[in-house]
Regions:
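N-terminal Rossmann-like NAD(P) cofactor-binding subdomain of oxidoreductases
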Residues: 3-4, 10-223, 255, 283-284
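Charged docking surfaces used in two-component/phosphorelay signaling
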Residues: 205-285
């Protein structure tokens, strides 16, 4: 049975550890920093096997190792299973889709270009799991942290109806800045938080950089990161939203105020969070 003939549902993806055969995965935007991170994280993964790497036309036809060259930014070497894969043209959607069960998307394009190409992949009946922000506010695209809002996957049948697909869909992750505090705030919902003030201290990897690329960041900070504050204030409300009439409606609160600072750290974001609750919270709780 070919990858295209397999009918793999969300439930099956969650239960893939029970499958005897790994899912065949493609990485879109594989030569960029986020694509590299996907490849490093998926090395020897028990559920997934990277079989396809796709990037811009200038990398097409090269081995992955040749295409990346000295731009490999991970601390571990390029995985042996990936370095000799031939890079495909990410714009040749049908050709790439025919080789995989689903794709992780990390393409570096404009917002509208990302929206268009991810929908093209979904319309080939290829599920798209995206690291990009382009579809985070598309009403029928689930933006999910599984520990917070797995029920948002229920919007996928409505998305499929819009796209005209049976298997293809798009799902996205939220901005990296909120993943440190949104899960904790979710756990505290019973105490009815109504106001949140957060300051995030974000590593340079969030900008796709290393200290080799960005030496001026050593011993330096940038007190404002364009676009990050809005994402940090609004995206948690979408995670806590409800599905109504086939779309995700964001929650009305709590009110979140955020300041985002770039700091001279290679990897890992930190958040200092102040929360006001309507209900009294004890130290033990």
């Amino acid at each position: 049975m070919s990858a295209r003939e397999k009918q793999i549902s969300i439930k099956e993806i969650y239960e893939v550890n029970k499958m005897e055969q790994k899912l065949k995965v493609g990485i879109l935007g594989a030569t960029g920093m986020v694509g590299q991170r996907f490849i490093a994280l998926l090395e020897n993964h028990p559920w997934f096997e990277v079989v396809t790497v796709a990037a811009s036309p200038r990398s097409e036809g090269k081995t992955y190792q040749e295409a990346v060259g000295e731009r490999w930014k991970m601390t571990t070497p390029i995985p042996e299973a990936v370095k000799n894969l031939i890079v495909m043209n990410v714009n040749e959607v049908e050709k790439v889709a025919a080789t995989v069960d689903f794709v992780f998307s990390a393409v570096d394009m404009t917002k509208e270009e990302i929206k268009a190409i991810e929908e093209r992949y979904a319309k080939t009946e290829t599920p798209v799991v995206s690291n990009n922000s382009a579809h985070r506010w598309t009403p029928d695209v689930p933006m999910v942290v599984p520990e917070i809002n797995p029920e948002h996957f229920d919007v996928i049948p409505f998305q499929r109806e819009r796209l005209g697909t049976k298997r293809g869909f798009i799902a996205v992750k939220p901005n990296c800045s909120i993943q440190s505090y949104a899960p904790v705030l979710t756990a505290w919902k019973e105490f009815e938080p109504y106001e949140v003030v957060a300051t995030t201290y974000q590593a340079i990897s969030g900008a796709g950089k290393t200290f080799k690329d960005w030496p001026e960041m050593e011993g330096n900070i940038i007190p404002y990161i364009g676009g990050e504050e809005e994402k940090s204030e609004q995206e948690p409300l979408r995670l806590w939203g409800k599905m109504e009439d086939g779309i995700i409606q964001k929650a009305m609160g709590p009110k979140i105020t955020c300041q985002c600072i770039r700091v001279p750290v290679l990897d890992g974001h930190t958040a200092a969070v102040f929360v006001k609750f309507k209900k009294t919270v004890t130290k033990a709780q």
